[in-house]
Amino acid sequence: MTGIKTTGEKKMMFFSGRAHPELAEEVAQQLGVGVVPTKAFDFANGEIYVRYQESARGADCFLIQSHTAPINKWVMEQLIMIDALKRASARSITVIVPFYGYARQDKKHRGREPISARLIADLMKTAGADRILAVDLHTDQIQGFFDGPVDHLFALPLLADYVGAKVDRSKLTVVSPDAGRVRVADRWCDRLGAPLAIVHKRRDKDVANQVTVHEVVGDVKGRICVLVDDMIDTGGTICAAADALFAHGAEDVIVTATHGVLSGPAADRLKNSKVSEFVFTNTLPSASELELDKITVLSIAPTIARAVREVFEDGSVTSLFDEQ
């Protein structure tokens, strides 16, 4: 007989960057593990230093980092942390990205543009990631950018069940804010047993990037409308869509989105909007930090934790969303 046999069991280790430690702690609590102590700081010139306080040799490592602002700093920190795990002889490295940065740059709209979402995936692979676990990617094709397994999680059950439990479903209409979100909105309709409406944007051909008319396809008069989107950044598009629904006789409008990016004028727009409630998950810390009465933040931590457990135990992540 040659070689050495081991009888040790698999070992999971859970790591977090500095971008959103609150979410990391929630996920760790759901898993019943602790976040591995990590020394991380910025040098005077902005370079990032990372060192783990425990050995990761032979462990199945899960590293969570959401790409919130300042996005470039947290992407770079995540890459450095992946590299550190690879050089620490981790058995496997699963990168958890609740919000995947640069996801809107997923194709070339014009010549001489980058496909930055692909670049992020390539950088993670080069750094040493074996698998990516992400929540509600902006487009499905991003799953194909990474040369390895990608587990795509959905916040739809969490968001839809929340809305369905608080409104009269007989008066509910699910609304897609544009043609690109119709497939997701249709799944909401299936889950809630509600009809579908679409806000169609028509642009002024003489003014670049100017939406002049919002046409509503579907009956929204006297209805409680729930606008569904994957992210809200500055809030301009979604608030304009809500205004169009009210103009067409909607009784009330609720806005839901997985990712509350909420940049620039978003706070004022949400505050001054006639929308009664904005519902986000905590993939990003932005929504909770605004502290507006009309903002509700639901925790995505249980969903992420269940997926992590399935990956670690060689189970099925897909089975978590089969009913969807």
Curated annotation (Swiss-Prot):
One of its GO terms (biological process) is ribonucleoside monophosphate biosynthetic process. Gene3D superfamilies: 3.40.50.2020. Its cofactor is Mg(2+). GO terms for molecular function: ATP binding; kinase activity; magnesium ion binding; ribose phosphate diphosphokinase activity. Keywords: ATP-binding, Cytoplasm, Kinase, Magnesium, Metal-binding, Nucleotide biosynthesis, Nucleotide-binding, Transferase. PROSITE patterns: PRPP_SYNTHASE (PS00114). It is found in: Cytoplasm. CDD domains: PRTases_typeI (cd06223). Mg(2+) 2 binds at D178. InterPro entries: PRib_PP_synth_CS (IPR000842), Pribosyltran_N (IPR029099), PRibTrfase_dom (IPR000836), PRTase-like (IPR029057), Rib-P_diPkinase (IPR005946), Rib-P_diPkinase_bac (IPR037515). The active site is at K201. ATP binds at N45, G46, E47, R104, Q105. Its main location: cytoplasm. It is an enzyme of class 2 (transferase). It catalyses: D-ribose 5-phosphate + ATP = 5-phospho-alpha-D-ribose 1-diphosphate + AMP + H(+). Its EC number is 2.7.6.1. Pathway: Metabolic intermediate biosynthesis; 5-phospho-alpha-D-ribose 1-diphosphate biosynthesis; 5-phospho-alpha-D-ribose 1-diphosphate from D-ribose 5-phosphate (route I): step 1/1. Involved in the biosynthesis of the central metabolite phospho-alpha-D-ribosyl-1-pyrophosphate (PRPP) via the transfer of pyrophosphoryl group from ATP to 1-hydroxyl of ribose-5-phosphate (Rib-5-P). Belongs to the ribose-phosphate pyrophosphokinase family. Class I subfamily. Homohexamer. This is Ribose-phosphate pyrophosphokinase. The lineage of its organism: Bacteria, Bacillati, Actinomycetota, Actinomycetes, Kitasatosporales.
